[in-house]
Regions:
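Beta-propeller domain segments
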Residues: 22-65, 173, 190-193, 208-213, ...
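Asp-box/WD-like beta-propeller blade repeats and closely related beta-sheet repeat scaffolds
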Residues: 114-117, 123, 128-130, 140-179, ...
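A short loop-to-beta-strand structural motif that recurs across blades of beta-propeller domains
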Residues: 101-104, 141-143, 204-206, 255-257, ...
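Surface loop/turn motifs at the tips and blade-to-blade linkers of beta-strand repeat domains
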Residues: 72-77, 115-121, 159-168, 217-221, ...
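Beta-rich catalytic cores
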Residues: 69, 76-79, 98, 113, ...
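Conserved beta-strand position repeated across blades of beta-propeller domains
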Residues: 74, 84-85, 128, 177, ...
Length: 409
């Protein structure tokens, strides 16, 4: 008996020792870091979780084309990113990630007020508005607020069980939106920087009926799409997708993709950008059958929100062109992005990318930025709203046609 007790005691002490010897897996963003970059200090930028005073937001540094104006429209929403506009255009809802809130901004005719709709959720990044209801998507929860635009005390309906959410957090902070078909579109990113997803439920885009029924997988091979919109004429879905990290400053670029039919494969994790095989995750003919991107958005640019412009305020040349927000890199030695670009697609299907709004990134060496633009929304009057996740603000970009010069007498 004493021998058995001694063995049991020895085993009890040995088990913790063995568990302590087992190294912890690296955080998801660290995965795929090559030995050649072992000493790199690059890491994701820390977001600001406190309110930024209006006077500390240097909106005057923003640069837009002649005739356009960028101004501070609302502030006081730390971490605010994806936006959903109410049916009447008088309220804007913003999701967040780490801070766990959803905000409501009310436009009372020149003055905006901000309130928190819901708090203490796990990365409620996804917000969508449809037929008077606000939908909120967190990592592990889906809530629907009926009639919230007219009733600030509206209580949520829990739809979580209807949407079959996978458990992993990484790349599953969601952008969600209703399409022209009335369906609710939801992406499910890869739970890693670079890996073969553990199950088929990752790395895809799905669509559902508004109540969560009718689940359909419409795209696979999607690493991390956090922005999409439908072309106003073709009704095709266009979406941004982040390229993998730890591939150097000239590494795999972010993508602008177009879904022309249900079931297309966009390559992840075997094939990236314009047909580049992954150096670690390999298979025979990795790019065979993969749909190539319409345009490349730059390496590590963090291409986020996209909006096809259909308003009447901007000059005609902007009609049916796309605005895409690039939040800005962290996995490059030389910063890239931190801007809004305008994308125009020719009759040949080729896209050209032009700068539109800049100024968030400061000059000089290293990462010196005061803001990080994230998403774009179109208002009923045709103005654009751009959210800034870093300072918790929304900017309004408007256009006024220059007045004709007075004729000389």
């Amino acid at each position: 008996m004493n021998k058995l007790v001694a063995l049991a005691v020895a085993a009890a002490f040995a088990a913790p020792a063995l568990s302590q010897d087992k190294p912890k897996p690296p955080p998801a963003w660290h995965q795929g870091k090559p030995a050649a970059m072992a000493e790199s200090k690059l890491a994701p930028h820390a977001g600001k979780m406190t309110e930024t005073p209006t006077g500390d937001i240097p909106v005057s540094k923003l640069k837009v084309p002649a005739g356009f104006k960028a101004e501070l429209w609302a502030s006081g929403m730390p971490g605010g990113r994806a936006m959903a506009v109410s049916d009447d255009g008088k309220k804007v809802y913003l999701g967040t990630r780490v801070i766990g809130r959803v905000y409501e901004v009310t436009d009372a005719g020149g003055k905006r007020t901000v309130r928190v709709v819901v708090d203490k959720l796990t990365q409620p990044a996804g917000v969508a508005f449809n037929k008077g209801a606000l939908y909120v998507f967190a990592i592990d929860k889906v809530l629907k607020f009926d009639g919230i635009a007219g009733n600030p005390n509206a209580q949520p309906q829990d739809l979580t069980a209807k949407f079959d959410l996978p458990p992993e957090q990484h790349h599953n902070w969601k952008y969600v939106a209703f399409g022209p078909d009335g369906k609710l579109y939801v992406p499910f990113g890869s739970p890693c920087n670079i890996c073969e997803p553990p199950t088929k439920e990752y790395g895809q885009i799905r669509r559902y009926n508004a109540d969560g029924s009718g689940k359909e997988v419409i795209a696979t091979g999607v690493r991390n799409s956090v922005g999409f919109d439908w072309h106003p004429k073709t009704k095709e879905l266009w979406f941004t997708d982040h390229g993998r990290d730890w591939a150097g400053d000239k590494g795999f670029e972010d993508e602008l993709n177009r879904l022309t039919k249900v079931g297309q494969n966009f390559g992840f994790p075997y094939c990236h950008a314009n047909g580049q095989p992954d150096p670690e995750i390999k298979k025979a003919d990795p790019c065979k059958g993969v749909t190539r991107p319409v345009a490349l958005m730059g390496p590590h640019a963090a291409a986020m929100g996209i909006k096809w412009y259909t308003g009447k305020m901007f000059p005609a040349e902007y009609q049916n062109t796309a605005f895409i927000v690039r939040k800005g890199s962290w996995n490059r030695e030389k910063p890239f992005g931190f801007d809004v670009v305008n994308v125009r697609v020719g009759e040949d299907g080729k896209a050209s990318i032009r700068p539109f709004a800049t100024g968030w990134q400061e000059g000089g060496e290293g990462y010196k930025f005061w803001g990080r633009p994230a998403y774009v929304a179109q208002m009923p009057d045709g103005a654009l709203l751009v959210s800034d996740e870093q300072v918790g603000a929304i900017y309004r970009i408007s256009y006024q046609k220059p007045k004709a010069a007075a004729k000389k007498q």
